Structures are given as C-alpha cells and as structure tokens.
Amino acid sequence: MKTSILILAAGLGTRIKSQKPKVLQELCQKSMILHILKKAFALSDDVSVVLSHQKERVEKEILEYFPKTQILEQDLQNYPGTAGALSGFEPKNERVLILCGDMPLVEQTSLEALLGNNAKLNLAVFKARDPKSYGRVVIKNDSVEKIVEFKDANTQEKEINTCNAGVYVIDSRLLKELLPLIDNNNAAKEYYLTDIVKLAKEKDVMIKAVFVDEDEFMGINDKFELSIAENFMQKKIKKYWMQQGVIFHLPQSTFIGADVEFVGECEVYENVRIEGKSKIINSIIKSSSVIENSIVENSDVGPLAHLRPNCELKNTHIGNFVECKNAKLNTVKAGHLSYLGDCEIDSGTNIGCGTITCNYDGVKKHKTIIGKNVFVGSDTQFIAPVKIEDEVIIAAGSTVSINVEKGALFINRAGHKMIKDYYYKKFQK
C-alpha cells in the first residue's frame, strides 16, 4: 500500500529561544527537518511539509537538499493547531503518515513497523518516564479510546503515563471524511489533530496503538532537549561505525558529523571532532584533532592537528600543531607546527617545523606547488604564488618568493653579524 507523508513544521517554536526557526536547529551539523526528510523520502516519493513561521527561510533549505518536497503553508490566524495544518493537503496515495518536524531521531525501521499495521488509524504511543506536558492516551481492550491534551486533562487523566508520540498513519479516505468535523472547542481554541481519534471512535473505527521508544520519538522544544537529542544521535552514529569496524578510544569525548563516512580500518582517539562530509579511509586520527570536510586516506593525523575544508591527504603523516586548508598532500610528512594552505605537495616531500605557505596577499588567495622528494628546512616561508620543482632542498630559515628549479639548493638568509665580548660590555662594569 502506497503512502503519502506529511510533516508538520509550522509552529513558532518560541521555547527554542532563537531567531533561527526550530526545525532548522542542527543536530550533528544537520538541521532537524533534514533528518526527518531523509527518512521520509526513503519511504515515499510523495512528501509534503507544512510551514508558516519564517516559511521562505525553511523552504529554501528544504528544497536545496530535497527539491521534490511539496511545500504547504498553514494559515495560523484562521486555522491554528495541528489539525489546521492539514487544510489544503491532498494526499496522492491510499494512506497518510503524519510526522512532526521536530522529531529527528526517528528511525526508518520504526516508521516501517508503524506502516506495517493495516488498521485504518494507527497511533504511535510510548510509556513516558516523566509524562510532563505530553497528550495522554487512554487505551481500552487494545484499542485507543481517546487522546487528551495536557491542557484539557483532568487530575485522573494526568496520572496516565501512556503518551501520544504525535505520529499517525491514517487511511486517506478516513482522513478526508473526519478532518472537516474537527472543531476548536478547547482551552487553546486550536484545531487538534488528536480529536481525529475521538471522531474515528464515534464511527467505530479500530484505532491501533503502536508502542515506540520514548527517546527515539522525542520532540525537541528547547535548547536543553536539543542537547539531549544530539547526544543520543552521537551515540547512535558512533555505535553504527563501531559495528562497521571503526575503533573509537573514549567515544563519549568525540564528535562525528551525521554525513561523515569511514571506510576500511580506522582508529579515532579521544577528543577528536570530524565534521561535514569528511571521509576517513584506513587512517588513524589521534587525540584532539579537528577535521572539516576533508578526505584522509591511508594516513595518520595528529595529535592536535587541524584539517580545514577541502584537504585531501593520501599516505601522509600530519603531526601535532599542523594546520592544513585546501591542501592536497600525497605521501608527505609534516611533523609539527606548520601552516599548509592552498597548496599541492607531492610524494616523498618532508615539511620542516615552522613552515608556512603565505597564501593571502590581502585581496585574494594564491597557490603553492611543491614537487616530489623536496626537503623543506625548518622556519621556511613560501610566498605564493610559487612553484618548487622536484628534488629541491630549501635551507632552514628561508623565505621563498621565486620558483625553484629541479635539483637546486635554495638559501635566503640575512647576513650574519657577531660582536665579540658584547655580553660583558653590556652587563658587566
């Protein structure tokens, strides 16, 4: 049975206390709406998102990554509430899966299990450790009797710990029949989607409660819950990669972005941060290193190294306090305390301590190209644009501002001066 998916993302999200819309808040470097859209498009090609607050901003991000998404706008003034979000929604398929845009931890397998039930109305519920302000679900004889919003619950109903996860699977024809019957006769004067349960019950529709994991189906309303969710997602990301063979030393101290990829045998030490679309292939990342949108293959990085965006390392050693940016290094050793930016360095080259590629002239960036088997002495500055041919020796302390031909020794130092007995003249009388 084909499914249309509707994601509710029109709320103001005032408790998140941010100028950025709630659904654009990031977990593991990806906004929560993108996390849920990835799961949605894995299940259906008919996916719609309901927006209102900062619609243009949210729509732009959604369509950048998921251009086939249908965008709907909720009229919050005339049709507030979760049921009001469905006005104007026309599903293309036999049933509808309704999701919340602030629920990024939901797994595709859990949604598949929810869709696997053939009841006309399925409701995701969970046993809450602390029910807080969740809507309470009253179940009788394995069928949902009603959902009571916390604002409208009486004292007895507030004692119930079975709560509404806010995820529904409903027959499209049933939805079309019941939606116009929902009213706003409640404390908040809103149109509640939860009322669809009461209306379905009045028509003797069997409503199936499907129990799900509370942590996985948590909604995010403030920055504290955002941090809890990100921590939960980090554990899942690292667990997945460890099951694929990656070794993490002290994994609770590392951060791995949602789009990071590991291939082969990799090892990650404590306090490492790997971001963006970085790809680590058969490599070791040592303590307290940061890698951003870079590819590391058959290499070791760190400790205390920083690979900024667009670095490509192959068969290379990057040591402590080395920073690279937009650098392609193939079979290179850069052991310590260097900046290698906007450069290409070829195989067999050794970069001495204190080497800097001076890539910025105050207006634009320039490139340094270093060939094969080059020995770069300590405290060398390359003034880009500059090209060093193969098999060159750069003497320590040199400032290189011209191209250097193959096989040459380059030395550029100020003249030496030594004043005999100067110490005694200065400090002894």
Swiss-Prot record:
Keywords: Acyltransferase, Cell shape, Cell wall biogenesis/degradation, Cytoplasm, Magnesium, Metal-binding, Multifunctional enzyme, Nucleotidyltransferase, Peptidoglycan synthesis, Repeat, Transferase. It catalyses: alpha-D-glucosamine 1-phosphate + acetyl-CoA = N-acetyl-alpha-D-glucosamine 1-phosphate + CoA + H(+); N-acetyl-alpha-D-glucosamine 1-phosphate + UTP + H(+) = UDP-N-acetyl-alpha-D-glucosamine + diphosphate. Residues 224-244 are annotated as: Linker. GO terms for biological process: cell morphogenesis; cell wall organization; lipid A biosynthetic process; peptidoglycan biosynthetic process; regulation of cell shape; UDP-N-acetylglucosamine biosynthetic process. Mg(2+) binds at residues 102, 221. It is found in: Cytoplasm. Acetyl-CoA binds at residues 359-360, 378, 396, 413. Its cofactor is Mg(2+). CDD domains: GT2_GlmU_N_bac (cd02540). GO terms for cellular component: cytoplasm; membrane. Pfam families: Hexapep, NTP_transf_3. Residues 245-429 are annotated as: N-acetyltransferase. Its EC number is 2.7.7.23, 2.3.1.157. The active site is at 336 (proton acceptor). Disulfide bonds: none annotated. Residues 1-223 are annotated as: Pyrophosphorylase. The keyword Ligase does not apply. GO terms for molecular function: glucosamine-1-phosphate N-acetyltransferase activity; magnesium ion binding; UDP-N-acetylglucosamine diphosphorylase activity. UDP-N-acetyl-alpha-D-glucosamine binds at residues 8-11, 22, 81-82, 135, 149, 164, 221, 308, 325, 339, 350. Catalyzes the last two sequential reactions in the de novo biosynthetic pathway for UDP-N-acetylglucosamine (UDP-GlcNAc). The C-terminal domain catalyzes the transfer of acetyl group from acetyl coenzyme A to glucosamine-1-phosphate (GlcN-1-P) to produce N-acetylglucosamine-1-phosphate (GlcNAc-1-P), which is converted into UDP-GlcNAc by the transfer of uridine 5-monophosphate (from uridine 5-triphosphate), a reaction catalyzed by the N-terminal domain. In the N-terminal section; belongs to the N-acetylglucosamine-1-phosphate uridyltransferase family. This is Bifunctional protein GlmU. It comes from Campylobacter jejuni subsp. jejuni serotype O:2 (strain ATCC 700819 / NCTC 11168).
